[in-house]
């Protein structure tokens, strides 16, 4: 089952991206390098509720 998640920038804490993930394949929190338009650079984004 796919669930909706939000990805937040670890530097400025803005919630920039919304996506889905499969809880069965990825039970732990997702971490991706994404572009943050507020920091104006690629930063680590972590899954939030």
Curated annotation (Swiss-Prot):
One of its GO terms (biological process) is translation. One of its GO terms (molecular function) is structural constituent of ribosome. It holds the Pfam family Ribosomal_L33. InterPro entries: Ribosomal_bL33 (IPR001705), Ribosomal_bL33_CS (IPR018264), Ribosomal_bL33_sf (IPR038584), Ribosomal_zn-bd (IPR011332). Gene3D superfamilies: Ribosomal protein L33. This is Large ribosomal subunit protein bL33. Keywords: Ribonucleoprotein, Ribosomal protein. Belongs to the bacterial ribosomal protein bL33 family. GO terms for cellular component: cytoplasm; ribonucleoprotein complex; ribosome. SUPFAM superfamilies: Zn-binding ribosomal proteins.
């Amino acid at each position: 089952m796919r669930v909706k998640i939000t990805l937040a920038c670890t530097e400025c804490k803005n919630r920039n991206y919304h996506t889905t993930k499969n809880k069965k394949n990825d039970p732990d929190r997702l971490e991706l390098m994404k572009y943050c338009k507020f920091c104006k650079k690629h930063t680590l984004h972590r899954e939030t509720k």
